[in-house]
């Protein structure tokens, strides 16, 4: 799992934006349905743009159809890795078997 802390968050310079990747493409319709079912906080889903945005434990998460994931308000790569494991468990049914 490739994780990079790319740049400081605008609202809190002590936290970063983590750029990650599932390693698989995302079926956006399934993803949006899954996130609605679990009542993801502040969910915004766009099938047309191929992106879902929601809040998870005080972090802003963006999942793209390509499999890219941006997590805002992260302190360390270990924290980002833990969030990614949580995300994979939440949305595994929306991940396609074909790699991106």
What is the meaning of each model-derived region?
Residues 1-45:
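Short Lys/Arg-enriched alpha/beta "domain-start" segment
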Residues 9, 39, 44, 53, ...:
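Aromatic-residue detector
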Residues 45, 97-99:
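Flexible, glycine/charged-enriched surface loops at secondary-structure junctions
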């Amino acid at each position: 799992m490739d994780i990079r802390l790319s740049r400081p968050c605008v609202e809190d310079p002590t936290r970063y934006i983590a750029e990650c990747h599932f390693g698989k493409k995302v079926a956006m319709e399934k993803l949006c349905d899954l996130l609605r079912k679990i009542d993801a906080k502040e969910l915004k889903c766009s099938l047309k743009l191929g992106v879902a945005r929601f809040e998870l434990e005080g972090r802003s998460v963006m999942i793209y159809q390509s499999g890219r994931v941006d997590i805002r308000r992260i302190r360390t790569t270990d924290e980002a890795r833990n969030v990614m494991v949580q995300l994979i468990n939440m949305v595994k049914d929306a991940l396609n078997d074909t790699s991106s």
